[in-house]
Amino acid sequence: MKIDILTLFPEMFEATLGGSILGRAQEKGILDIKLTNIRDYSKDKHSKADDYPFGGGAGMLMLAQPIFDCLEAIGVTGGAPEKKPSRHVIYMSPRGRVLDQSRIRELASEQDLVILCGHYEGIDQRCIDYFGMEEISIGDYVLTGGELAAMVLVDSVARLVPGVLSGEDSAMGESIYSGLLEYPQYTKPREFRGMEVPEVLTGGNHKLIELWKYEQSLALTKERRPDLFEEYVQNTAAPDKDHKKILERYLNSDKMKVYASGIKDEKE
């Protein structure tokens, strides 16, 4: 997958893109991520990339000229709505569609993305219109700029690109847990300050471990994100009768509570 990131602050991305999973994926040639400094395309002698908005208002607005020239330099042609842009351009914007796992899966299936990071009070609307940009938000809160949001987008999308994660991790991402919150996890030692790891996880019975994880995920999702739980129930079928039995118990129970040793009904 090819990803171009346009920003006024490319240095913010160095640690995120250079290490861990994203760094290894680039070394393997699975991801091709390039950073471009929008300021390099400013025609102002001081590399100015912003100005006051027409009609007044607080703050500064990113200029159209550097953004247009920057996009065209990396091969993006515009002309929307009459002409479809040559590349999919995403503008990280608080007024955009809120990013969710469904949209992440869709974006992960694409081979070419351009991500524009706004700053100050945003960008000239003509940039959005001419290049047919998709506006995406990562939540209902305010950030200083689009760089952090772009990092979230790149990381979440890259994880679903084949080969970026190990086979085991990739399979888990597309398993029955997709759409549910993650189950609790433990590592050594088995007992720490009087707190023990649930016995089922150390017993070696892989089927029981699988069912325990599923039940924990269901319980956490129903308790903390009932919206996700409802969506999961409507769109996902239990893979076998054992999972179905657990799911039906949660559908028929008003409230469940998570315990370290397992799941218990609060009404008991």
Describe the role of every protein-language-model region:
Residues 63-119, 162:
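S-adenosyl-L-methionine/SAH cofactor-binding core of RNA-modifying enzymes
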